[in-house]
Curated annotation (Swiss-Prot):
Entry protein name: C-type lectin domain family 19 member A
Broad class of where this protein is predominantly found: secreted
PANTHER family linked to this entry: MANNOSE, PHOSPHOLIPASE, LECTIN RECEPTOR RELATED
GO cellular component: extracellular region
Glycosylated residue positions: N58
Top-level taxon of the source organism: Eukaryota
Underlying gene: CLEC19A
Organism: Homo sapiens (Human)
Ranges annotated as spanning the membrane: none
Disulfide bonds: C68-C178, C151-C170
Compartment(s): Secreted
PROSITE patterns reported in the protein's UniProt record: C_TYPE_LECTIN_2 (PS50041)
Upper classification of the organism: Eukaryota, Metazoa, Chordata, Craniata, Vertebrata
Amino acid sequence: MQRWTLWAAAFLTLHSAQAFPQTDISISPALPELPLPSLCPLFWMEFKGHCYRFFPLNKTWAEADLYCSEFSVGRKSAKLASIHSWEENVFVYDLVNSCVPGIPADVWTGLHDHRQEGQFEWTDGSSYDYSYWDGSQPDDGVHADPEEEDCVQIWYRPTSALRSWNDNTCSRKFPFVCKIPSLTIH
């Protein structure tokens, strides 16, 4: 019986080498490499390396900015949201709409021209490289009396483009969206 086992093993070894010729096989990962995960605080939503949160609290622009600064990730404090692309503008508006579906909401952003009229800047210090003003905006409150309009909101008007921007009086009270860089795990 032992001879039979040795003979069968030798036979299978020789024939399997002929039946299945050796080839170079390279194995690639089944899944593509994923980007590094990022972390946002609880109840915040991530979009392209930043965390966002809608607050349905009616506050003046300054109160909203101060409220945002109370939240932090690492050493960074949140600010009223800055917006740098159409996609980000849509994300912010849709974030608001997902929290208050079907209810039109005007929301504060971090854009303002407090220092010099017509020279807009973001509260987080990022560049003013994108805008989506409504047709007649910014108008610095041509119709407002007596206050100027130095703070910017995403507004909803049935006659305006969805997600368009308007400069408004900073003392008006609206809900707002805060933004902060997300933590990246290395």
